[in-house]
């Protein structure tokens, strides 16, 4: 097994671990998911370039009669990348105490303000940063608004 094969295997394992965490573990962490909202996919061109480069590498490896194991690893990485970039939806998961955005848990107490922009972005102001959340379906913004009103923390 060459160094290239080891690197490809590491990337495949990391992609698969991320997919398992994102689809199976994160929805069960920190209590049950009360609301799940699909977000708009970003970086479509970047992911298409990545998958295209992998396809070129598979073609070159086959035409240069490279190792079959390397071809298999490249093809597997391409399939996993297609799943991660095109079949899986980025999501916003609302829990009892906070929400997951970008695989990071944010407690509701950290929210300082919320606004809705004209172009459909939900802007959430935190202590030190601002989140720009763009949902896949604009009707989801109404669901988020209703959910946050219902689960608003009462002052002590």
Swiss-Prot record:
Pfam family, one: DUF986
Keyword Membrane: yes
Keyword Transmembrane applies: yes
A GO cellular component entry from the record: plasma membrane
Domain of life assignment: Bacteria
Keywords, sorted A to Z: Cell inner membrane, Cell membrane, Membrane, Transmembrane, Transmembrane helix
Membrane topology type: Multi-pass membrane protein
Classification via InterPro entries: DUF986
Bilayer-crossing regions: 6-26, 46-63, 67-87
This protein's name: UPF0266 membrane protein NT01EI_1718
Organism, as annotated: Edwardsiella ictaluri (strain 93-146)
